[in-house]
Amino acid sequence: MFEKFTNRAKQVIKLAKKEAQRLNHNYLGTEHILLGLLKLGQGVAVNVLRTLGVDFDTAKHEVERLIGYGPEIQVCGDPALTGRVKKSFESANEEAALLEHNYVGTEHLLLGILNQSDGVALQVLENLHVDPKEIRKEILKELETFNLQLPPSSSITPRNTNSSSSSKSSSPLGGHTLGGDKPEKLSALKAYGYDLTEMFKESRLDPVIGRSAEVERLILILCRRRKNNPVLVGEAGVGKTAIVEGLAQKIVSGEVPEALRKKRLITLDLALMIAGTKYRGQFEERIKAVMDEVRKHGNILLFIDELHTIVGAGAAEGAIDASHILKPALARGEIQCIGATTLDEYRKHIEKDAALERRFQKIVVQPPSVDETVEILRGLKKKYEEHHNVFITDEALVAAAKLSDQYVHGRFLPDKAIDLLDEAGARVRVNTMGQPSDLVRLEAEIEKTKQAKEQAIGTQEYEKAASLRDEEKKLREKLGNMKQQWESNKEEHQVPVDEEAVAQVVSVQTGIPAARLTEAESEKLLTLETTLQKKVIGQSQAVASICRAIRRSRTGIKDPNRPMGSFLFLGPTGVGKTLLAQQIAIEMFGGEDSLIQVDMSEYMEKFAATKMMGSPPGYVGHEEGGHLTEQVRRRPYCVVLFDEIEKAHPDIMDLMLQILEQGRLTDSFGRKIDFRNTIIIMTSNLGADLIRKSGEIGFGLRSHMDYAVIKEKIDAAVKKHLKPEFINRLDESVIFKPLEKEALSEIIHLEINKLGSRLQNYQMDLNIPDSVISFLVTKGHSPEMGARPLRRVVEQYLEDPLAEMLLKESCRQEARKLRARLTEERVVFEREEEAVSALAIEGDGSEPITADES
C-alpha cells in the first residue's frame, strides 16, 4: 500500500500518528491525516488548503471540538489504522492511477480522505465552510501550474459516481470542470514569481533606508520610452536587491511618478521555472506564458535577481536560452525588466552578449559609507530586536559599521555590518537567555513520572498509574506557570547588545582582538618591554621600538590604513633579530604559529615574486595562490618576518611598497589581502662587515658616540642597497648592537635553564657555578658570530657528557643532583651529595666523564 508513497506522504503519516498520540487516541483516523497534511507545511495539498483559508491551528481546534481528547490511560505503541483510513489510502492510490501519476503524494492523500463521505476530516472541512469540490478544483489547478501531464478528461472516471454520471462528467476530480469546458489556468506570474509590492504591503520585507540616488536613477530609467530596463551592478552584499525593494516601498507609498504608480513589482524565480522541465519546449513554454501575461496586464515590472543566469538558462542541444527569448520583447518595450548581478558576472556573461547588454541600462551600486551604514542599521534595528528579544544600543550600531569596515575583509558594507549585528544579538540571546535550571529539573521530573506511569500501566498497577497521572498533571501545571512567568520576565527585561558584544563577534570571526582593553591586557602591554627583554638579551632599543608600535595599535591611535608597525632590523648575525620577532608572536599574537617567516634567499630570481602573491592565470600553480598572501588571508593578525632581505632580487622589494604604505597587497586572483593588522619586520646583515672591521669600536660599544658612528656607517650601507622610497615607508630602522660579555653570560644562563628543564624528565638537577659559565662565555666569545657559538659550546661542554651519563644504566635508578666543576679546561660532572663523579661506580676507581672524553 505504501510502496508508491513519496517521502512527504510518509512524513504526513508520521505526523498524523503524533497528532493521534497528542490527542490520546489509540487509532489513526482521517482527521489525523488532515492534521498531518497541514502540519507538514509544504506540498500541493498544503498549498491548496491554505489557498482556501484552512491552516493547522484552525483545523486542530475544530478536531478537538468535534472529538476531543481520549482517556489518559492508554496502550503504548503506534495507533491502529481505522477502516476509513485504509480505504482513503486505497482511494489515494486509485486517484494517482487515474491521473497517470506513478507516485502517491500529499495531493492524492487529500483526495483520498475527501472520498470518505462519512469521515471526520470531511466533516471538519465542511464545518470550516470549505467545499470539497473547490478543493478538487484547486488541486487540479496546482498540478497544471507545474506542467504535470494530466490525462485526457475522457479517460478519467470520477470517484463515488455511477456509470451514468460518469458519462455526463469526465473531470478527473469528481466531475467538476474548471470554469466551463476549458480548464482555467493559474497565473504564471503567481506560479513562478513573488510580488514584492504585495509583500511590502504585508510588512514581510525589511524597510529600506537611504539609497535615494540609486532608487531615483532606477525610476528615471523605468520612465524612459526605449531601453527602459535597468540593471544594478555591484559587489555582493552592497544592497542591490534592497534597492529594488526600496522601489517597491515607494510604489506602495505612492512616492513615484504617475507612470509607475499602479505598477506591480514581481521577482521572477528562474530556478523554479526550470525545475521539473523534462521535455524540450516546456521551459520555453513557461517563459512565453510569463511574457504573455506581462503583455496582457501591462502594469508588471519583472525583477530578475542574478541576471547573468538567463544566459544559457534552459539551453540544450539546439535550443535557445532565456536571454534569446527575452531579447525581442525587451527591445520592443513589450516587457520591462530590472536585473541585478555582480561586476564579475556582468563582465563574464552580459558584456559578452552585446545585443543583450544594450537592452539594459547599467547602474553601478557602490558600497555605502560607514555613516550611511549606521543609518541603514538604525532602520533595521527594530526587526533584529524583535527577533532576538534584545535591546540594541546605538553604540552597537556604530561599532558594527566601523569594526566591520576595519576588520572584516573580502566582503562589503552594509552586508557585513548587518551580519555582525545579527550574530551579536544571537550571541547575547544564547548566553543570557538559557532556560532556568528550575525548569530543566522540573521537565526531567515530569519525564521520570511519565515513565513510571507507563511502567505501572504495563504491570497493570492501575491505582499507582492513576496516582502518577495526577502527580504528572500537577507538575505540568506548575511547569506551565513557571514557563509563563519566565517568558514574561524575558519580555520585560531585555538584555542590551552593546559595543563590547559586537567587538567580541569580530574577535571570534577574525582572530583580531577588537574588544576594549581589559585591565589585565593593559597591564600586559605596559610590562611587555620588560617581558621581552628577559628573552631578548642586550637589545633594549629594538624591544622598545616594537613595544611602542603594539601599544599604538591596541589603543587605536595608529594610522588605520597602514600596518601596525614596519621595522628594518640591522646588525651583525646572531644578535637576536629573528628571536625578537618570534618572542613578539608568542607574547602578543597567541603563539609562534602567528609568525609568518619568509626566507628572502628563496627570492633571488626576479620571477620568484610569483611565489609570494601567486602565479598569473594560465601558469602552473595559479590555483594554489601565493605563499605569503594565502597565509596572511587566513591569519590577518600576525607578525610577518622577511628574513635577510638583502638576498632577494631588488625588483621583488618593490612589491612591499604598497604593503608598507597602504597595508594591502593584491594577489593573483585580484583579491586585496589586508596587512593592516600585521607587524612587518625585515632583517638584514647590511653593514655587518663594518662592525667587524671597525677598529674604533671593537667588541662591545661603550659610549653613545660609538653607537652613533656605527649607526651612520650602517645607514650609509642601507641607502646604497635599498631604494629611498622603500626606506621612507619604514616606521623605524633599528640597529642591533654587538653583544657584550655580560649579555652573553645571561644568554648562557637561559640556555642552561632550557637544558635543566629537559633534564627534569630524567630526575636530574644541574648546578652550574659562575666559574663554569665564565669558561663557556670565553669559549663561545666571537664578535663576528654573535650568540650562536654559545649553542655549540653548550652542546660540546654540557650536553655531550650528560647524554653519555643518561646512557649508563646505573644513572637512571634514582634522583640525583649534579654539580659541574671546571678542571683543566674541562667540565666535570659530580654528584653534589658525595662530591664524586656522577659516572663513577662507588669503589671502582673510575674517572669522571669530562667534555673532552665525550
Swiss-Prot record:
ATP binds at residues 234-241, 571-578. InterPro entries: AAA+_ATPase (IPR003593), ATPase_AAA_core (IPR003959), Clp_ATPase_C (IPR019489), Clp_N_dom_sf (IPR036628), Clp_R_dom (IPR004176), ClpA/B (IPR001270), ClpA/ClpB_AAA_lid (IPR041546), ClpA_ClpB (IPR050130). Residues 151-182 are annotated as: Disordered. Residues 151-172 have a biased composition (Low complexity). Keywords: ATP-binding, Chaperone, Nucleotide-binding, Repeat. Residues 443-478 form the UVR domain. GO terms for molecular function: ATP binding; ATP hydrolysis activity. This is Probable ATP-dependent Clp protease ATP-binding subunit. Residues 5-70 are annotated as: Repeat 1. PROSITE patterns: CLP_R (PS51903), UVR (PS50151). CDD domains: AAA, RecA-like_ClpB_Hsp104-like. Residues 81-145 are annotated as: Repeat 2. SMART domains: AAA (SM00382), ClpB_D2-small (SM01086). It comes from the Bacteria. Belongs to the ClpA/ClpB family. ClpC subfamily.
